[in-house]
């Protein structure tokens, strides 16, 4: 799992380790995880844009499914859109190439950030007007298309879900649009409330 220390990964790694065993879920992140998660199973410091290191990790651990969660989130992406494009697209392309050559499946989340102001607000269909207004949304839409391409062209089993805004206690604010809500809870705990 790339991006294991983020809002989704910090919850999903322990859940998957509980289901499949600590040695069957390899958590990776660009930064060190909290000690409890890092020590509960396999962990590697890994930059998901480094396709060679990613390929070596997948091969050495005989990975069958990559959960690709590493990303520059929306608010951070607006402060540095070039970095958001590079990290989000280069890491996804690296994951898809590794999956293609090593025969593993890929799950990568998308976001309601793919939509825009022209998208119907109620009962939004899967296939509709998509005019994202953030670099994060643009990379998620491009990512959906890239996953579809790898499935159609190379047979890579890719899956995804468009998540709404996420709020999690499992990870500190990481640059997303819902960080203000997460920060409220962290600040309250730090201030003794």
Regions found by a protein language model. Give the residues of each.
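Conserved beta-loop-beta element that borders a ligand/cofactor-binding pocket
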Residues: 145-170
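N-terminal Rossmann NAD(P)H-binding glycine-rich loop of SDR-like oxidoreductase domains
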Residues: 1-19
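Conserved Rossmann-fold NAD(P)-dependent oxidoreductase catalytic core, especially the SDR/UDP-sugar
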Residues: 86, 93-135
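NAD(P)H-binding glycine-rich loop region in Rossmannoid oxidoreductase-like domains
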Residues: 48-87
């Amino acid at each position: 799992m790339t991006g294991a220390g983020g809002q989704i990964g910090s919850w999903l790694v322990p859940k998957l380790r509980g289901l499949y065993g600590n040695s069957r879920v390899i958590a990776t992140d660009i930064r060190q995880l909290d000690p409890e998660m890092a020590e509960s199973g396999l962990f590697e410091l890994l930059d998901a844009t480094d396709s060679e290191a990613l390929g070596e990790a997948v091969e050495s651990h005989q990975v069958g499914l990559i959960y690709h969660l590493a990303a520059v989130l929306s608010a951070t992406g607006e402060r540095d859109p070039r970095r958001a494009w590079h990290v989000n697209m280069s890491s996804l392309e690296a994951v898809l190439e590794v999956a293609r050559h090593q025969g593993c499946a890929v799950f990568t989340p998308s976001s309601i950030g793919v939509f825009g102001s022209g998208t119907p607000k109620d009962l939004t269909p899967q296939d509709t007007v998509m005019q994202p207004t953030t670099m994060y949304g643009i990379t998620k839409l491009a990512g959906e298309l890239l996953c579809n391409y790898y499935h159609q062209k190379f047979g890579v089993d890719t899956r995804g879900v468009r998540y709404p805004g996420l709020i999690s206690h499992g990870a500190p604010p990481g640059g997303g649009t819902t960080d203000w809500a997460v920060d409220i809870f962290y600040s309250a705990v730090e201030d003794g409330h």
